[in-house]
Amino acid sequence: MLGFGPFELILIVVIIALLFGARKLPELGKGMGRGIKEFKQEMHEPSPPRPQVTDIPSQRLDPVTGAPVSTESTVPASDRRS
């Protein structure tokens, strides 16, 4: 697979130092350490209970406007034929 010897590791460290600068490396290390620590803490903490989802009756939506459409007839009661 990947055989990283001492020469390859030194080369990688030198390239990183050139890209970020020697002064930024401690800050990068601290940031990565904090991120890993927070990630591990979150993995061990139980997640808060999720709220129970209840069935909500679905509404019909107008396909053009996306507004809810009344399920009742739009014809006034006086104009309806029985």
UniProtKB/Swiss-Prot annotation:
It is a single-pass membrane protein. GO terms for cellular component: TAT protein transport complex. One of its GO terms (biological process) is protein transport by the Tat complex. The keyword Protein transport applies. It is found in: Cell membrane. The keyword Ion transport does not apply. Keywords: Cell membrane, Membrane, Protein transport, Translocation, Transmembrane, Transmembrane helix, Transport. It comes from the Bacteria. The chain crosses the membrane at residues 1-21. One of its GO terms (molecular function) is protein transmembrane transporter activity. PANTHER family: SEC-INDEPENDENT PROTEIN TRANSLOCASE PROTEIN TATA (PTHR42982:SF8). Belongs to the TatA/E family. Part of the twin-arginine translocation (Tat) system that transports large folded proteins containing a characteristic twin-arginine motif in their signal peptide across membranes. TatA could form the protein-conducting channel of the Tat system. Forms a complex with TatC. This is Sec-independent protein translocase protein TatA. It comes from Deinococcus deserti (strain DSM 17065 / CIP 109153 / LMG 22923 / VCD115).
